[in-house]
Swiss-Prot record:
Its job: Plays a role in mitochondrial morphogenesis.
Membrane topology label: Multi-pass membrane protein
InterPro entries: TMEM11 (IPR026120)
Domain of life assignment: Eukaryota
Gene this chain is encoded by: tmem11-a
Official protein name in the record: Transmembrane protein 11-A, mitochondrial
Originating organism: Xenopus laevis (African clawed frog)
């Protein structure tokens, strides 16, 4: 029974790894006066700018707001990619006389989402983070020290590839829309 409760590092097993102090930051929910919410926001901003690998947000309100902000950014990214792809692939799937009814609005939507993401999210340090839901990865974090039962955990991820992807697709959709509008109105 000495190994009960431990994971064995064998084939298919996972070894529990401890994190260094510089990898994880916890925004604790400690109310010290009237400006506690401002203090939580300040701590979160400092942690985002310090680029910690993991940020654990204990205060419910600011954690929910941050999770929603990340979700909206993800939605804009996915909408830009999917609508841009629809814009570019619709002419291959539909007859030429009908394809512009789908491809032009999809291209405009892709460009709008990509532009909004670029203006509102691109320079925000929060866009480098994703909300973590994986139970194994969460088990590696020092969550036993928290007072909140449902903290929001952010993990830093490199987003350069996703930005390149949605910008490339949006620009290709823009080029297609300009070409198609020129063809439609030059005749």
């Amino acid at each position: 029974m000495a190994t009960w409760g431990r994971r064995r590092a064998g084939l298919g097993g996972r070894e529990r790894v401890t994190l260094s102090a510089g990898e994880c930051y916890i925004v604790h929910e400690i109310y010290n006066g009237e400006n506690a919410q401002d203090q939580f926001e300040y701590e979160l901003e400092q942690a985002l700018e310090a680029q910690y690998k993991y940020i654990v947000i204990e205060p419910t309100r600011i954690g929910d707001e941050t999770a929603r902000w990340v979700t909206v950014g993800n939605c804009l990214h996915k909408t830009a990619v999917l609508s841009g792809t629809a814009c570019l692939l619709t002419p291959l799937a539909l007859p030429a006389e009908y394809s512009h009814y789908v491809s032009l609005p999809a291209g405009v939507l892709s460009l709008a989402c990509s532009t909004l993401y670029g203006i509102s999210w691109q320079f925000d340090p929060c866009c480098k983070y994703q909300v973590e839901y994986d139970a194994y990865k969460l088990s590696r974090l020092p969550l036993h020290t928290l007072t909140s039962s449902s903290p929001v955990v952010l993990v830093r991820k490199d987003d350069i590839h996703r930005k390149r992807l949605h910008n490339t697709i949006a620009l290709a959709a823009l080029a297609y829309c300009i070409k198609k509008l020129y063809e439609l109105y030059s005749v």
